[in-house]
Regions:
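Enzyme catalytic cores with a strong preference for nitrogen-chemistry domains
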Residues: 1-193
Length: 193
C-alpha cells in the first residue's frame, strides 16, 4: 500500500508542466477514505504540496474508494453495518484535487453487475467465483451524474469506467454543466487500448 501511494505521487510529479488536468486511473488509491476526513488526509495534503511546487494550475482527477457514514434513520438501500453498528456505503468515486480547499467528489452511479453490485450477503457466499480486476467488489453505494468539477473556468464531468456504456447517464454530466468529460478507468477492463 505504501508502494502504491508512492507510485501515485510519482505519477503526479511526472505530469507535464502547464497541465490543466491530470487524470489518474479508477483504483489508483491504496485505501478507502472516510469522506468526512478526506480533505485533511495525508495523501491529499501531499498531492496539494506537489501541485503547488510543480503544477499549480492543475487539477488531479483521480479514482478513489470513499466511505460515507449515515445515521440509522438515513441509511440507504445499499448501506451496510459495521461491527460497531454504524451504517455506511463504500463508493467507487472520482475526486478533483487542486491547490484550493475545495474537493469535489462524484460517486459512480452505474455499477458493474456481479462485481460492484452484489448484495453483501450474496457476495460473501459466492466470493470464490469473483475475478479480481482491481477495485472494490461487493455492493457499492450508488451515485448520480454529479455537478461538474470546475477548475480554472472549465467545467468537466468525471464519469467512471462502466458509466460510459450508458449514454443517457453519461449525458447527465453535460446536463449538469460539463463542457468536457474526463473518464477515470482501469484500462485492463478494455483490453489493449
Amino acid at each position: 500500500e505504501q508502494m502504491q501511494e508512492r507510485l501515485l505521487l510519482s505519477m503526479i510529479e511526472e505530469a507535464p508542466a502547464g497541465s490543466d488536468f491530470i487524470v489518474l486511473p479508477e483504483t489508483v488509491w491504496p485505501y478507502a477514505y472516510d469522506e468526512r476526513y478526506l480533505p485533511q488526509a495525508p495523501v491529499v495534503t501531499k498531492i496539494r504540496e506537489i501541485l503547488r511546487e510543480k503544477s499549480s494550475g492543475a487539477m488531479i482527477v483521480t479514482g478513489a474508494e470513499t466511505i460515507v457514514y449515515y445515521p440509522p434513520e438515513e441509511q440507504t438501500e445499499t448501506a451496510r453495518q459495521n461491527e460497531r453498528g454504524a451504517f455506511y456505503d463504500k463508493f467507487n468515486s472520482t475526486l478533483g484535487i487542486d491547490t484550493t480547499a475545495c474537493l469535489p467528489i462524484h460517486h459512480k452511479g452505474r455499477l458493474v453487475i456481479g462485481v460492484e453490485s452484489t448484495p453483501t450477503w450474496i457476495f460473501k457466499a459466492l466470493k470464490f467465483l469473483v475475478i479480481d480486476l482491481g477495485g472494490t467488489v461487493g455492493q457499492l453505494g450508488v451515485g448520480e451524474p454529479g455537478p461538474a468539477f470546475v477548475h480554472n473556468g472549465v467545467s468537466v464531468g468525471t464519469p467512471i469506467c462502466y458509466e460510459g456504456l450508458y449514454g443517457n447517464f453519461y449525458g447527465g454530466f453535460v446536463r449538469e454543466g460539463a463542457r468536457a468529460l474526463l473518464i477515470s478507468s482501469n484500462d485492463g477492463w478494455w483490453g489493449d487500448t
